Structures are given as C-alpha cells and as structure tokens.
Amino acid sequence: MASDFIFMLTHADRTIPDAHDRVPEALAAGVRHIGFKDIGLPFASLRRLADTIRAGGAILYLEVVSLDAASEEASARVAAELGVDVLMGGTRPPVVLPILAGTGIRYYPFPGEIVGHPSVLTGTADTIVESACRLASLAGVHGLDLLAYRFQGDVPDLIGRVCRTVAPKPVVVAGSIDRTVRIAAIKKAGAAGFTVGTAALDGAFPARSTRLVDQLTFIAEQASLS
C-alpha cells in the first residue's frame, strides 16, 4: 500500500536554518506534505515558512518537541497561531486539546513514553500499544505519531500492532527513517504515512545523487509504490 511521505525541514530534531530556501526544492520533487518542528527558528521565521509551504499547495505539519507541560502548551499555541493543518507529537492531550478546539487542526500525539532529545520511545510494545489505544479513544485525537525506529525492539511488529489497534485512525511513523527497507516495512505494517528529514538532507538514500531534490524524488517514489 502507498503511504504519505512527509518531508520534515529538520536535522537532528531541529528546524534547519535554511528551511525556507528548501521548500521550493521539496515542491519541485512533488512533495505535498511538508513540516517542521517548533524549535530551531524564531516564531517570525516559522510564520514565513508556514506561509511559503501553504502557498505551494502543500499540507502543513508542525511536530512538537516538548519535555514539559508548559513548553507543550506553548507549542500548541504556536500551531494554532500558524494555522497548521496537522499538529504531531507531544504527550499531553489534556493540555493541547483545549487550545486546538475549534481550529480545525488535526492532532496526532505520541503514544508511549518519550524521553530525551532527540526523542526516544521507551517501554515495552505492550505498554506502547496500550498508550496508543487510550490516546486514540480521545475526542480530538485524529491519529498518532509513532516514534517506531526510536524503540528498542521489533519495530515492524510494533507498527503493525499500533495500526491495527487504533484503526481506522491513521498512524504516522516518525524518526530515524533513513533507508529504503524501513520505508517498505512501514508501508507493509499499514502506516498511513512517515516522516523523513535528516536522512534526506544528509543524502542517505540511494537516489540519483545526494542533492535534496533527488533524495526527495526517490523517497516519494518509494512511498507511492503499492
């Protein structure tokens, strides 16, 4: 099955300084799902970036990188002010949901326990699946953002279990997707989409070249394969 490829303008879980200049390359590669994180650039730059992505006709994502309630609340307010299409990440729906109410923003929090930066998914597969089930049952949670390849265990099995548990709500797999075999595993397990940032910027995929437009074109082709 095909999955949505979400290009994140991030490196090592931070929005890159030249993110605005990279958007035309992503659009030229046919990417129509583009996101960034709430750290790495000041708010004014994030607003300009969001406007450019929207003007290009792409769906706009913001992924939260917050380790405490206050910063997660601030991130949700940034998402609301920017008018993103999808807010991904975070672990505190009671903090975020009141802020997003009435905005039309789709919300995909992280299941499981997230620690550190860059973020790591801890716990067992069972506890992560239980967390996913609880989150997906909440009104206002539209899907999940699963840091599957930041988990020490059977990753394809975890993705499949989470996808089956929360269906029909979509699961996006994020973090450390840096090789073709991982994209194939994500799709086979039933995830609706996946994010790539650092790996594309580093030229990690076996595309025609390490140029970003070639990397993104290659990843988009892999995502669209049935």
Please place each PLM-identified region on the residue numbering.
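A short acidic, helix-capping loop that chelates divalent metal ions and anchors anionic groups
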Residues: 7, 115-119, 202-206
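Glycine-rich phosphate-binding active-site loops on the catalytic face of alpha/beta enzymes
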Residues: 82-95, 139-151, 176-178, 182, ...
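Anion (oxyanion) recognition and catalysis
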Residues: 27, 54, 101, 187-188
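Conserved N-terminal beta1-alpha1 strand-loop-helix module at the mouth
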Residues: 1-61, 66-70, 76-83, 133-137, ...
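Hydrophobic faces of well-ordered beta-strands that scaffold small-molecule active sites
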Residues: 3-10, 32-36, 60-64, 86-89, ...
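Short acidic, glycine/proline-enriched helix-loop-strand junctions
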Residues: 51-59, 96-107, 114, 166-173, ...
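Charged helix-capping and loop-helix junction motifs
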Residues: 47, 122-130, 154-160, 209-215
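Conserved anion-binding
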Residues: 57, 65, 70-151, 165
